[in-house]
């Protein structure tokens, strides 16, 4: 290391040139590194959508969902498989392990799907190649003129606007929500059908035969070629009415479709609806970003396309969700924090050194050390987000420590022997830096390497904190290298030959006067000091036990997601009425900019919502426009009080947080209970019982079992003997049920780019009542007339409208929100005890706690490994530096004392112990070790200068070298303070990271200044 320092001092031009090149490269990569709000913390998922028209959820579950789920469970790297069976379709979510490439996962899913035998008529497709963070932009089409109905707006969105947006880079899909889908409806009069002696198959054949096109290759006319084509696609309901079903051979008269049916254009059955600000139904769109894309660039592309799109007169776009605002605000918040921290550090250095020129090496060093890491971030595809910038923010105070000590030591040497020539200055700077460089290099290496265990985090917490760990490690590694290369050159070239002595600095004089009596008490009563140290170290663990736990602190995203669920199923029109009332109430809050609500699901596999679920996105105004004293917690509480509707249970959260939770565990609240079994009715009844038991716990704020709305079914059960008498099979009867009563699509009308289904079914007058269906007559292929009541039993029954499954078991979820003053661990422990005592589970049924609790337990287990691992790494590095077991253990044994400060400040601030806080604790371990190394280094230098009088050596190391120790601790401490005063987006996570570091560094400073001299007095002390 001495040779390297001498080389850079002898070649300052080359060192500065190389540094300038790296600065230029760093500035370029700063502008090229993508921006995002948070890292993509969602699991790799592949969604399978299976459609089987006319089938009920039970049939869908048994014949589609279960076979697919059971096959996917055996696919490699599969972590979980969840299924949703609903009328006409099934959605299966296949969740893969960390690090699985999404396109590899999609190919495996397709491979396993190819080996599954599914019923005829089932169509399969994969959902978008997107994650839970894919919903980046939403909009609504609003007709201000009153000219257009919802069907027109939905058609415009589906067949024009959607394709315009899809043409932009980075878009995986655009999902429509709300409005009415157009379809051709053929309502048959069964009496007219019978009167003409026609069968259903005659009608079906006529419909299909009237909607087709054909090509006749080419003909040659007058030496020119003409392509022959037959244009037979229907253009209007009148075209269908003219379709010939049968011709009378005697009279030649044709029986047309219009003679036996009413043909009209109508609206298909709605799966969902949307509302804007409580003013009425609108058509909306959800832009889904492709996995791995740059969200900010994608949203800019969408806005550009929308700005270039011509809309029908009187129709306008209204943005209902825009993540780019979150990204810009979050990154802006952290950039401001970095600037504040940097200024704070520079002010502290200038005050302690009491010279502007003396602090210039630090002023130059700091921005360079922050810019160069961007080169590696760009190469490693790490986005600029609140976590990656947070890693830099945590490093600012520490990364200048080596430079501070080097500058201060150079000051000390120049005070004793002011250089007269550049050569003398060279030797003084070289000697001063070489004296402290090895220990400083090791202390920075300790901070850098001790944070490496954070990379062992897995799951969501790993994806969240690895960017922070990368940037913190990169920043510290760059700072470590620059400290022994660039910093010596800056000190040599910038520091003046004559410096003001430490005694001339009033700050240092005050510090000496304050510290000297403390030092004398410490060395006079060393055993008392050591005893207090040990007691406080033990107390740290008692404080920890009193701090509640949580998985992750809330991240203010600048918008809210309100998700009420109906206890019982509601008709769509009633649900829309509730949606409008809720939205209009929420819009009255002065903090609210816009309210966009939807009931049911969007037309996309990423949305499994049922008609009993509402999702309302609430865009909030900037906090500076809020009422005085209003916080996000108070606002949610006020809103929740205003939107209490009978039969609806409210859930509140942030859009990204809730969507990630729903993907990773299926639970949309912080905590949930999954009841698993084989019978949907039994599983649901057990879930309701879990709700009742947990609601009785005083620690429970809300508990709500996700009841599946009951659908009424008309069950038509074939009488096989009767069918045989008429020469019919079950398939004949089922075909009539599906086509005439159910109205399955027979064909599609092609109108340019647009496609609309053609449905044949009984006119409403003949299917309104069960008796109508029972009396309904049809003609058999043999010409016999038979009624449904003759060949089938018809009865009314109830069954679930949706069946959920979790890893092959039928599942029902209980959503739980514990009260804010209890930790998740403690709540689950009590809840498990109460459930085991009061819930009677039949054989084959079980319950598990899920939601963020799953992530918390996994993260706690990992932390139980990586924190001891970090301590072991620190010990090894300390031993490599000191070559002394005693000194290495002295630093390690200081950890509990610093934790007293860390946990104490967390407790005072009312913060829960989250994974973010534990990551802060890991960072604190390295900081505490660094301060210990610096103190021991100066104590050893003092003992070396006074070999015959150790007490004087301790005095020299502690008191005479007070400035560098206080400077390093103060810069670290003060650099973190600005974080605690931030209130903008992204600040909540950073506060939980910084709080244990601030409390710990403060007590680490007390440790090195008070306890270390006492220990050295006991071990080495003699003299006066």
Spans of model-derived segments:
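Interfacial segments of transmembrane alpha-helices in multi-pass membrane proteins
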Residues: 2, 6-13, 328-385, 452, ...
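Membrane-proximal extracytoplasmic
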Residues: 1-342, 384, 463, 624, ...
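C-terminal transmembrane helical bundles of large multi-pass transporters
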Residues: 323, 638, 642-1023
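Signature of alpha-helical transmembrane segments and their immediate interfacial
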Residues: 1-35, 430, 434-436, 503-553, ...
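Cytosolic juxtamembrane regions of multi-pass inner-membrane proteins
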Residues: 307, 312, 327-336, 353-354, ...
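Juxtamembrane segments of multi-pass membrane proteins
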Residues: 533-641, 678-699, 720
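Interfacial helix-loop-helix hairpins and adjacent transmembrane helices
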Residues: 1-16, 415-431, 460, 466, ...
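Transmembrane alpha-helices and their membrane-interface boundaries in multi-pass membrane transporters
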Residues: 385, 395-411, 436-456, 464-503, ...
């Amino acid at each position: 290391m001495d040779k390297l320092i001498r080389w850079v001092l002898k070649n300052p031009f080359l060192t500065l040139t190389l540094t300038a090149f790296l600065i230029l490269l760093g500035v370029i990569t700063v502008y090229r590194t993508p921006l995002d709000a948070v890292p993509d913390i969602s699991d790799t998922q592949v969604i399978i959508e299976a459609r089987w028209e006319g089938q009920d959820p039970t049939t869908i579950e048994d014949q589609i969902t279960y076979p697919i789920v059971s096959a996917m469970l055996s696919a490699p790297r599969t972590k979980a498989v969840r299924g949703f069976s609903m009328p006409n379709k099934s959605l299966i979510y296949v969740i893969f392990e960390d690090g699985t490439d999404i396109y590899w996962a999609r190919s495996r899913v397709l491979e396993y799907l190819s080996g599954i035998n599914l019923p005829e008529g089932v169509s399969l497709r994969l959902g978008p190649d997107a994650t839970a963070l894919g919903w980046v932009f939403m909009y609504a089409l609003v007709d201000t003129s009153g000219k257009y109905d919802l069907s027109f707006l939905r058609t415009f969105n589906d067949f024009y606007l959607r394709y315009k947006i899809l043409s932009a880079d980075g878009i995986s899909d655009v999902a429509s929500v709300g409005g009415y889908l157009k379809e051709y409806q053929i309502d048959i009069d069964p009496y007219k059908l019978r009167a003409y002696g026609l069968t259903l198959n005659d009608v079906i054949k006529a419909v299909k035969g009237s909607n087709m096109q054909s090509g006749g290759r080419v003909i040659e006319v007058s030496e020119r070629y003409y392509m022959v084509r037959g244009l037979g696609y229907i253009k209007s309901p009148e075209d269908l009415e003219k379709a010939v079903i049968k011709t009378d051979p005697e009279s030649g008269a044709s029986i047309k479709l219009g003679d036996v049916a009413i043909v009209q254009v109508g609206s298909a059955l709605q799966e969902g609806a949307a509302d804007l600000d409580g003013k009425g139904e609108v058509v909306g769109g959800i832009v889904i970003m492709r996995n791995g894309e740059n969200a900010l660039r994608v949203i800019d592309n969408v806005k550009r396309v929308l700005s270039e799109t011509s809309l029908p007169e009187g129709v306008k776009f209204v943005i209902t969700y825009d993540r780019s605002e979150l990204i810009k605000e979050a990154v802006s918040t952290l950039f401001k924090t970095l600037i504040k921290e940097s200024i704070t550090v520079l002010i502290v250095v200038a005050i302690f050194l009491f010279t502007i020129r003396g602090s210039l090496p630090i002023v130059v060093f700091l921005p360079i050390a922050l810019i160069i890491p961007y080169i590696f971030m760009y190469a490693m595809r790490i986005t600029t987000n609140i976590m990656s910038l947070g890693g830099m923010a945590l490093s600012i105070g520490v990364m200048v420590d080596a430079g501070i000590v080097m500058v201060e030591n150079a000051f000390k040497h120049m005070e004793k022997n002011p250089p007269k020539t550049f050569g003398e200055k060279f030797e003084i700077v070289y000697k001063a830096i070489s004296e402290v460089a090895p220990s400083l290099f090791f202390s920075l290496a300790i901070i850098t390497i001790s944070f490496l265990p954070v990379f062992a985090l897995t799951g969501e917490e790993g994806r969240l904190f690895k960017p922070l760990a990368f940037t913190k490690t990169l920043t510290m590694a760059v700072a470590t290298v620059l400290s022994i290369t660039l910093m010596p050159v800056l000190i040599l070239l910038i520091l003046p030959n004559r410096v003001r002595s430490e005694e001339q600095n009033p700050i240092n004089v005050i510090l000496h006067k304050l510290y000297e009596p403390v030092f004398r008490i410490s060395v006079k009563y060393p055993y008392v000091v050591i005893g207090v140290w040990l007691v406080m170290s033990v107390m740290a663990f008692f404080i920890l036990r009193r701090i509640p736990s949580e998985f992750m602190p809330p991240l203010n995203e600048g918008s809210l997601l309100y998700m009420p669920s109906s206890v019982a199923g509601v008709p769509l029109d009633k649900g829309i009425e509730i949606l409008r009332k809720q939205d209009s109430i929420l819009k009255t809050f002065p903090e609210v900019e816009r309210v966009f609500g939807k009931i049911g699901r969007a037309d996309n596999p990423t949305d499994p919502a049922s008609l009993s679920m509402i999702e309302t996105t609430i865009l909030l105004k900037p906090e500076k426009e809020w009422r005085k004293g209003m916080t996000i917690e108070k606002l949610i509480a006020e809103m929740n009080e205003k939107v209490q509707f009978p039969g609806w249970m409210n859930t509140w959260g942030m859009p990204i947080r809730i969507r990630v939770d729903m993907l990773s565990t299926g639970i949309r609240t912080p905590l949930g209970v999954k009841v698993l079994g084989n019978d949907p009715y039994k599983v649901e009844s057990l879930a309701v019982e879990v709700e009742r038991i947990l609601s009785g716990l005083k620690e429970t704020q809300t508990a709500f079992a996700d009841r599946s709305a009951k659908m009424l079914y008309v069950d038509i059960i074939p009488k096989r003997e009767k069918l045989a008498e008429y020469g019919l099979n079950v398939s004949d009867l089922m075909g009539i049920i599906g086509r005439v009563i159910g109205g399955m699509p027979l064909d599609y009308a092609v109108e340019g780019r647009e496609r609309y289904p053609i449905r044949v079914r009984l006119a409403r007058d003949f299917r309104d009542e069960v008796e109508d269906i029972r009396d309904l007559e049809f003609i058999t292929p043999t010409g016999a007339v038979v009624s449904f009541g003759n060949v089938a039993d018809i009865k009314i029954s109830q069954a679930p409208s949706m069946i959920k499954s979790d890893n092959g078991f039928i599942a029902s979820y209980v959503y739980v929100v514990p009260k804010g003053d209890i930790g998740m661990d403690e709540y689950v422990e009590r809840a498990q005890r109460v459930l085991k005592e009061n819930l009677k589970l039949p054989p084959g049924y079980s319950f598990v706690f899920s939601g963020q609790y799953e992530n918390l337990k996994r993260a706690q287990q990992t932390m139980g490994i990586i924190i001891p691992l970090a301590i072991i790494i620190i010990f090894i590095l300390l031993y490599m530096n000191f070559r002394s077991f005693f000194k290495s253990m002295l630093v390690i044994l200081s950890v509990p004392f610093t934790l007293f400060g860390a946990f104490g400040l967390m407790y005072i601030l009312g913060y829960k112990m989250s994974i973010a806080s534990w990551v802060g604790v890991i960072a604190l371990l390295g900081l505490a070790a660094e301060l210990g190394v610096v103190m021991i280094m100066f104590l050893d230098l003092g003992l070396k200068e006074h070999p015959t009088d150790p007490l004087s050596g301790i005095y020299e190391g502690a008191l005479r070298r007070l400035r560098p120790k206080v400077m390093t601790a103060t810069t670290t401490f003060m650099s973190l303070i600005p974080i605690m005063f931030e209130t903008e987006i992204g600040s909540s996570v950073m506060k939980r990271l910084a709080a244990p570091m601030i409390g710990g560094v403060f007590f680490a400073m007390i440790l090195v200044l008070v306890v270390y001299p006492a220990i050295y007095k006991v071990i080495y002390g003699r003299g006066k």
